[in-house]
């Protein structure tokens, strides 16, 4: 057991040192404060799919006016038009101009539809960031290590592509999937040695298993590349501060692992834009309150 723990620590250290020198703004040390010993600063982004009925220009305007620092742009999941529109109409220079106009940073492309390869060059030329995708089908507990190793081996070409385009690939946990449980998170971080690969943690799916979100955050550690502030409730109650989950322990855990990305309030469902904006404003304020409460222990 001690050897396994030492191995995990060494692998995590390798991931940290490998990523530190090449990390784009999406995962930069800006999230860690002015110095290694400084207080962790929470940064907020949100996803364009929340405004999928609007153009990408209008979505960026809404997100910026709400005070978010960065954006996660979605491909065609549930018909979201934004990323394909950027690819076909704006291109990397047009996207950079649009984001600069609204003083937004590019955090991520969510590529559940289309895959990373399709958007890798665009992401790199737009400044680099995180590409979020799923894992693979579930497996029996006794098969977990072998299946995770095979899955990560299969991602090596994508990790090389991410390095070429100064980007990162974050694998999201999901119900009924390979990456779904605390044990699967442990297997991922133990086996993964690429600084280009990490985890996109969706607490919604952690909660469905009645597992601890702070524990999941701490297991992921420096391999946590994307964090959804997202709870297991229906409708708008999936959002922070709208649903009942106390996310202060989540924020404290993010600070403990010195999470380098943005905290991304999220929900599935597509209310009218003004309703969505009002709920995201509640989430923004709520997360800031959580950070304030947690900061005593940060």
Q: What spans do the regions from the language model cover?
A:
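Charged helix-capping and loop-helix junction motifs
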Residues: 86-93, 144-155, 183, 212-216, ...
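C-terminal segment of N-terminal export signals and the immediately downstream linker at the start
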Residues: 25-54, 58-62
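Short, acidic/polar
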Residues: 53-63, 114-123, 211-216
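N-terminal secretory signal peptides and thylakoid transit peptides that target proteins
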Residues: 1-18
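Structural motif corresponding to the early beta-alpha repeats
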Residues: 69-158, 163-168, 205, 235, ...
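Conserved, mostly hydrophobic/aromatic
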Residues: 46, 63, 71, 99, ...
């Amino acid at each position: 057991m001690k050897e396994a723990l030492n191995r995990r620590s060494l692998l995590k250290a390798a991931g940290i040192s490998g990523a530190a020198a090449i990390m784009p703004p999406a995962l930069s040390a800006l999230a860690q404060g002015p110095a290694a010993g400084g207080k962790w600063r929470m940064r907020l982004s949100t996803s364009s799919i929340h405004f999928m009925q609007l153009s990408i220009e209008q979505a960026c305007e809404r997100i910026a006016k709400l005070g978010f620092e960065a954006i996660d742009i979605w491909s065609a999941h549930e018909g979201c038009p934004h990323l394909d529109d950027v690819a076909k109409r704006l291109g990397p220079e047009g996207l950079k101009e649009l984001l600069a106009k609204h003083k937004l940073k590019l955090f991520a492309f969510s590529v559940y539809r289309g895959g990373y390869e399709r958007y890798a060059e665009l992401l790199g030329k737009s400044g680099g960031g995180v590409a979020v995708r799923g894992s693979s089908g579930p497996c029996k507990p006794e098969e977990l290590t072998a299946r995770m190793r095979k899955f990560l081996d299969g991602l090596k070409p994508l990790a090389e592509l991410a390095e070429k385009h100064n980007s990162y690939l974050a694998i999201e946990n999901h119900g009924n999937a390979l990456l779904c449980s605390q044990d699967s998170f442990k297997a991922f971080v133990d086996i993964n040695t690429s600084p280009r690969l990490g985890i996109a943690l969706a607490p919604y799916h952690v909660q469905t298993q009645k597992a601890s979100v702070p524990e999941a955050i701490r297991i992921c550690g420096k391999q946590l590349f994307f964090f959804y502030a997202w709870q297991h409730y229906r409708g708008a109650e999936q959002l922070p501060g709208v649903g009942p989950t106390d996310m202060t322990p989540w924020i404290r855990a993010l600070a403990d692992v010195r999470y380098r990305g943005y905290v991304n309030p999220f929900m599935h469902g597509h209310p009218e834009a003004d309703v969505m904006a009002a709920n995201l404003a509640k989430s923004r304020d709520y997360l800031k309150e959580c950070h304030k409460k947690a900061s005593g222990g940060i």
